Amino acid sequence: SGKSMLAKRIPSILPDMSFDEMIETTKIHSIAGTLKHDGLITTRPFRSPHHTVTPVGLGGGGTGTIRPGEVSLANNGVLFLDELPEFSRTALEVLRQPIEDGSITISRSGQKCTYPCSIMVVAAMNPCPCGYYGDPTRKCTCSEQKIKRYLNRISGPLLDRFDIHVEVPAVKFEELRDT
């Protein structure tokens, strides 16, 4: 239905980064070792971790130097969580406080580090495990209990932090072509 394609386009419609945002974003990526060049990062980050990401991968941590996780690598940009219910509940719960505070504090082995994470979180999911609940052309094969279990993978407090919920129905190719 184009949910992922839509999410990938969001950074292109956001305002240009300020110089301070460029510096801050570049610093985070430098610490993480993810800079692809020597100059400033001038475009808003778009991070899309796989649903198997660990809580440490999402929030940050590690041994030795406390490294930023995906929430901080997306700072001043977009963190896209595709197939939201497929992420572990433990990993998703890491997001609650950073979304609220705009920063994340990581404590590991007596060390404490705070990274900024002013992020737009965008998530996509199907209405049920098979993906066809409510589809006018295909029959959903999920039981009511299976759908409920699927939707309950996401906690209410996390859902409360999403300001906008949009249903994106499948559109036939012919309808797109004719518009």
Question: Model-derived features: where do they sit?
Answer:
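Walker A/P-loop
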Residues: 1-38, 101
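Inter-Walker segment of RecA-like/P-loop motor cores
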Residues: 39-61
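AAA+/SF3 P-loop NTPase mechanochemical coupling elements
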Residues: 46-47, 67-76, 106-126, 137-138, ...
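Short gly/ser/thr-rich secondary-structure transition/capping motifs
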Residues: 59-65, 102-107, 145-149
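Walker B catalytic acidic pair
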Residues: 76, 82-84, 94
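Conserved D-loop-proximal element of ABC-family nucleotide-binding domains
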Residues: 88-90
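Conserved catalytic/switch belt of AAA+ P-loop NTPases
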Residues: 92-113
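Phosphate-sensing "switch" segment of ASCE/P-loop ATPases
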Residues: 114-118, 128-179
